[in-house]
Amino acid sequence: MRLSTNSRRLLVDTNVARSASESQHPISDACRQVMEAMLREQHRVVLSATQYWEWQKYQSGFSKNWLRQMVGRKLHVVLSPEPNSGLTDRIYALEGADKARAEMPKDVHLLENALASDDLVLSQETNVFGLFCKYADALQIPRAVAWVNPADDAATCVAWIQTGAEVRKARCIPAGA
């Protein structure tokens, strides 16, 4: 199978994989639609060992079948070894940022994995997104990273995926100075 020229490598957070199901609940429906669009448009899912373990523990039945299809079509990228850009050390070095030091390490793997691929994250995490944005300069984030929440607006997210999932067309964690 030949990949589309617009094929991108996207991180799909475990919270999206867990939420995506056949249920007609708005969040489940939104996450499912976005993951189905990734498959149709031949974008690739990026998984590190940490993320794969999280997926195995928390994924829905829909997500399990979706990942099986992605792997079968060779639409997956395994990051090995896991990226380590020093972000975790810089998070723990933040002064006067107790909340940030407590919250950001839980999801720093998403940011590091995105920086090691195409700078694209699908996640429902809004608090940590705000913290990464607030501390982008101190963390020395090298370039903007798209952080897209499928539950915010599924139709817009699906359209974004269908048109090539470009970083510049999404809400982003800014590059640090």
Segments and roles (model prediction):
Residues 78-134, 173:
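Active-site neighborhoods of divalent-metal-dependent phosphate/nucleic-acid chemistry enzymes
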Residues 17, 52, 128-129:
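A generic structural signal for short hydrophobic patches within well-formed alpha-helices
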Residues 18-23:
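Short N-terminal binding/cap micro-motifs at the start of the first secondary-structure element
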Residues 11-12, 24, 28-62:
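PIN/NYN-family metal-dependent endoribonuclease catalytic core
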Residues 4, 120, 126-177:
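Acidic, PIN/NYN-like endoribonuclease modules and their adjacent C-terminal/linker elements
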Residues 1-9:
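Non-catalytic pre-domain segments flanking phosphatase-related domains
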Residues 44-89:
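Short, surface-exposed acidic-centric catalytic microdomains
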Residues 8-10, 119-120:
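The start of beta-strands in P-loop NTPase/AAA+ ATPase cores
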